[in-house]
Amino acid sequence: MINKGEMYMKKKGMNPWVCIGCFCLLGLLIGLFPGYRFSAGICFGIAALIGLFQLLILLGKTHPKLSKILKTAFSLCLSLGILAAAITGAAIMSASYGRTEQESGRLIVLGAGVNGTVPSLSLRERLDAAYAYLQDHPNTICVVSGGQGSGEDISEAECMYRYLTAKGIDPQRIIREDQATSTQENLTYSMDLIGWEYASSVGIVSSEYHLFRARLMARELGMDPIMIPAETTYLSLRVNYFLREIAAVWYYMILGG
């Protein structure tokens, strides 16, 4: 792979150091936009890989055998990484459709950021999905789950409660859980309020890219939830978040939390 890549760049007249500079510049530009930091990080990562590639080429001039071994190891690791990312991405994509048609008597709405007292775009998308589900299933009780973080004047739970009641959902159908600071806490604390007897039938509302990881966490807690997706409005953000979620899934599987 490395040799072919080197030959291709020479054939096309590409200067690898110019490529590195371009990816770094692209990363800096993308990083200026809120919500796209992970995509910016990918650009810097590609630049780093190209730089490492060039170092291996330079090493080959003085230590050809060592360079060959390192090139082979690099190619293998890169190939396995791409394969693992592709498989994980496919699993995330498959889980993103959820099961909106299935009825659940209890619903958990996972929190997201609040700007002061106003729901962020991601949180608003989740709330709109929850609202649609509650409208279609008038007997369903929901828990809005999320504590108060930095830059938030009220808890995520309070923000969600205000949003749903303003849209006409009966306040008696909404339970506020305002202590959770992570998805695992969202699920655990919400189930404590709902009752664990609903573990096999509870619905969970979250962004479509987050459903796969949320389901992994739920199953670890002994739940078998109905996953309900909230569609990310902008395609560019959706791609960014799906890519970020691949890394988040592996982080969770390796380190937990």
Where do the model's predicted regions map?
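Short, Lys/Arg-enriched N-terminal segments with co-localized hydrophobic residues
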Residues: 1-8
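Membrane-embedded alpha-helical segments of integral membrane proteins
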Residues: 13-60
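Short helix-capping/hinge motifs at transmembrane helix termini and TM-loop junctions
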Residues: 34, 195, 255-256
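Perimembrane helix-loop junctions in membrane proteins
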Residues: 58-61, 92-99, 256
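Membrane-interface helix-boundary motifs at transmembrane edges
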Residues: 59-71
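Internal/C-terminal transmembrane anchor helices
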Residues: 68-91
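A structural signal for short, hydrophobic/glycine-enriched beta-strand patches
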Residues: 87-242
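A transmembrane-helix-recognition feature enriched in membrane-embedded lipid enzymes
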Residues: 238-257
